[in-house]
């Protein structure tokens, strides 16, 4: 039943850009009236935070469980792109996310995925063409077109790309962008195609060009891509066109903080408090037309209580008048989610990862901790008995992708630097964006054990050293069906195991691994079909002439 109550404090009015003592009266989950007050407790009332672009699945939690974790940090809603599960299950996956999140006191805004699969150079579990996208956009609970990753298609006027953009425009729904590194005239053409936002900027110069082209920028700080430090000076340049987002946030990170962390960091650097809070609370609501309250009379009673605007400790979170979190504890009950999946891969053998030596010079992916992009190096090929092999002493490891959507497939194998493994292997069925099984390892037998642990669990993340540990992800091979705190603890233990037993010093090894198959972000990536140059947008050989 919607709540009715009154609460007093120092109200942070983000529209008037003022702070005043007030009593807020909530009636049936709606803010009935706001009255001036002379004496109020030393606490602040302000609108709740919105994550302006996030893949809920990356937290390895279904929406209902994601909400339980996020409200603890003052988040009351998300702009969520469900293209992870859509790549596995198609429209059924999108409908699953909407249905799982609907009963929870939280505002999920799921978009229509625009690029499923992300490219034609990989195998996914589904394909969403213009008709399927249009049908999703017909729904009132699908308020926008998710990130258009096919920026070459948008720039070149590819009919299927423009059809999806047009489907959103005729329904007066926003179109999200995704254009890492796009500069110059291409930016103007991309924006002219109808793209309104971007969250992929890694340099402030890139962001300025996109702002100049008329786009809005979501400043991203997730578990893999961390762009806050580079982009936050934009708060002094274009505060009215900024939002905050996490994009991809793993369960351990979500347990520790969310958008509140970015707000706190921005405020501590001295940026205007109203500019910062409007970016975190108001701009996503206005841009996407979300039915989320902004602490005004007649709004849904969505707001948070914090101790002060410096420490910004979230004491209480309210959604439609319901107290959903208090002093770091969620009040949303855990409800078991349905399990849906598609996982057809069979176990592999160590011999499946053999690579005949095809030359003296080897093309190697260079992975970068806390970034989605990669580099490329050419090294002398390490060999043994006629095969190209991993060389942990030089941090040259094998990288493999196994097609999860067929029973019979040969792993695609390449080589990578950056993980620093002394031995063993790790594997994951979270492998953007088609979510095959991606693995990195120092030995073929360890690669086989890590991959097979994921295969037998029908989805998960694993690490193989002397033993093998696995975190099962039975929901589409992406999400757990356990409570968020259990998932966070198990994920942390597995990451610690990778550092202690496999020797990696990476901050987020599983997140970094999961993006090595994302072909739409350059430079060098690996799909289940081979080594791919994301800048040239073509397959390349493992060996260099």
Curated annotation (Swiss-Prot):
<keyword id="KW-0378">Hydrolase</keyword>
<keyword id="KW-0464">Manganese</keyword>
<dbReference type="GO" id="GO:0006146">
    <property type="term" value="P:adenine catabolic process"/>
</dbReference>
<dbReference type="Pfam" id="PF01979">
    <property type="entry name" value="Amidohydro_1"/>
</dbReference>
<dbReference type="InterPro" id="IPR011059">
    <property type="entry name" value="Metal-dep_hydrolase_composite"/>
</dbReference>
<dbReference type="InterPro" id="IPR006679">
    <property type="entry name" value="Adenine_deam"/>
</dbReference>
<dbReference type="Pfam" id="PF13382">
    <property type="entry name" value="Adenine_deam_C"/>
</dbReference>
<comment type="similarity">
    <text>Belongs to the metallo-dependent hydrolases superfamily. Adenine deaminase family.</text>
</comment>
<dbReference type="GO" id="GO:0000034">
    <property type="term" value="F:adenine deaminase activity"/>
</dbReference>
<protein>
    <recommendedName>
        <fullName>Adenine deaminase</fullName>
        <ecNumber>3.5.4.2</ecNumber>
    </recommendedName>
</protein>
<dbReference type="InterPro" id="IPR032466">
    <property type="entry name" value="Metal_Hydrolase"/>
</dbReference>
<dbReference type="InterPro" id="IPR026912">
    <property type="entry name" value="Adenine_deam_C"/>
</dbReference>
<dbReference type="InterPro" id="IPR006680">
    <property type="entry name" value="Amidohydro-rel"/>
</dbReference>
């Amino acid at each position: 039943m919607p709540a009715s109550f009154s609460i007093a404090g120092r109200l942070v009015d983000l529209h008037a850009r003022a702070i005043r003592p007030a009593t807020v009266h909530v009636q049936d989950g709606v803010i009935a009236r706001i009255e001036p007050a002379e004496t109020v407790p030393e606490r602040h009332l302000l609108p709740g935070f919105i994550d302006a672009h996030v893949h809920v699945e990356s937290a390895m939690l279904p929406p209902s469980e994601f909400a339980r974790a996020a409200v603890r940090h003052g988040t009351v809603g998300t702009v969520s792109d469900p293209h992870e599960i859509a790549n596995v299950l198609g429209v059924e996956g999108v409908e699953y996310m909407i249905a799982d999140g609907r009963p929870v006191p939280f505002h999920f805004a799921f978009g229509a995925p625009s690029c499923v699969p992300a490219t034609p150079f990989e195998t996914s579990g589904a394909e969403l063409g213009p008709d399927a996208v249009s049908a999703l956009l017909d729904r009132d609970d699908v308020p926008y077109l998710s990130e258009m990753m096919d920026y070459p298609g948008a720039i070149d006027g590819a009919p299927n790309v423009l059809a999806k953009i047009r489907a959103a425009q005729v329904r007066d729904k926003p179109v999200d962008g995704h254009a890492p590194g796009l500069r110059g005239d291409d930016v103007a053409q991309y924006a002219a195609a109808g793209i309104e936002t971007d969250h992929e900027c890694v340099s402030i110069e890139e962001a300025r060009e996109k702002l100049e082209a008329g786009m809005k920028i979501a400043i991203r700080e997730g578990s893999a891509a961390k762009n806050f430090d580079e982009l936050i000076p934009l708060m002094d340049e274009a505060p009215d066109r900024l939002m905050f987002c996490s994009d991809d946030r793993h369960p351990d990170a979500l347990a520790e903080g969310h958008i509140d962390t970015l707000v706190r960091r921005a405020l501590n650097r001295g940026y205007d408090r109203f500019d910062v809070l409007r970016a975190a609370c108001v701009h996503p609501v206005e841009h996407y037309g979300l039915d989320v309250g902004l602490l005004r009379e007649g709004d849904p009673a969505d707001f948070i209580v914090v101790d002060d605007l410096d420490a910004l400790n979230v004491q209480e979170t309210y959604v439609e008048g319901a107290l959903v979190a208090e002093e770091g504890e969620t009040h949303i009950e855990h409800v078991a989610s349905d399990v849906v999946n598609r996982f057809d891969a069979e176990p592999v053998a160590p011999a499946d990862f053999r690579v005949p030596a095809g030359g003296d010079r080897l093309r190697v992916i260079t992975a970068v901790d806390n970034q989605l992009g990669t580099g490329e190096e050419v090294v002398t090929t390490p060999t043994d008995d006629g095969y190209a092999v991993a060389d942990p002493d030089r941090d040259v490891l094998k990288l493999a992708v196994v097609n999860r959507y067929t029973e019979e497939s040969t792993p695609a194998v390449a080589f990578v630097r950056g993980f620093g493994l002394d031995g063993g292997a790790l594997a994951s069925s979270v492998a953007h964006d088609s979510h095959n099984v991606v693995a990195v390892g120092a030995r073929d037998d360890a690669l086989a054990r890590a991959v097979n642990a994921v295969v037998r669990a029908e989805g998960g993340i694993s690490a193989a050293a002397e033993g093998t540990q696995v975190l099962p992800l039975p929901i589409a091979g992406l999400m757990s069906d356990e409570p968020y705190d259990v998932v966070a603890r198990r994920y942390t233990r597995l990451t610690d195991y990778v550092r202690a037993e496999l020797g990696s010093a990476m901050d987020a090894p599983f997140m970094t691994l999961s993006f090595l198959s994302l072909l739409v972000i350059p430079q060098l990536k690996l799909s289940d079909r081979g080594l791919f140059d994301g800048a040239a947008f073509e397959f390349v050989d493992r060996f260099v002439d």
